[in-house]
């Protein structure tokens, strides 16, 4: 029998995910600039989709890099 536990989402459902909030977006990307998967961030599917769109929009507007060259 599988045991499921409720996870607390790191982003509150009332909080808006915005492409201009770079500090929040940086928490959900790796050092190489890749978007972290839902299973490691603990977000809901809806929040993950909004986060992904916000990160991609921030990349296009040059607020976030596509790749980190370190």
Swiss-Prot record:
Its source organism is Pyropia yezoensis (Susabi-nori)
Lineage: superkingdom: Eukaryota
Q: What is its main location?
A: plastid
Q: What is this protein called?
A: Small ribosomal subunit protein bS18c
Q: Which family does it belong to?
A: Belongs to the bacterial ribosomal protein bS18 family.
* Location relative to the cell: Plastid, Chloroplast
Taken from the UniProt record, the cysteine pairs bridged by disulfide bonds within this chain are none
Stored InterPro entries? Ribosomal_bS18, Ribosomal_bS18_CS, Ribosomal_bS18_sf
Database matches in Pfam families: Ribosomal_S18
């Amino acid at each position: 029998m599988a045991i499921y536990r409720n996870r607390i989402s790191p982003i509150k459902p009332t909080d808006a995910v915005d492409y201009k909030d770079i500090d929040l977006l940086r928490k959900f990307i790796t050092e190489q600039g890749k978007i972290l998967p839902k299973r490691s961030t603990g977000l809901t599917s809806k929040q993950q989709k909004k986060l992904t769109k916000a990160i991609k929009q921030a990349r296009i507007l040059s607020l976030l890099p596509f790749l980190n060259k370190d």
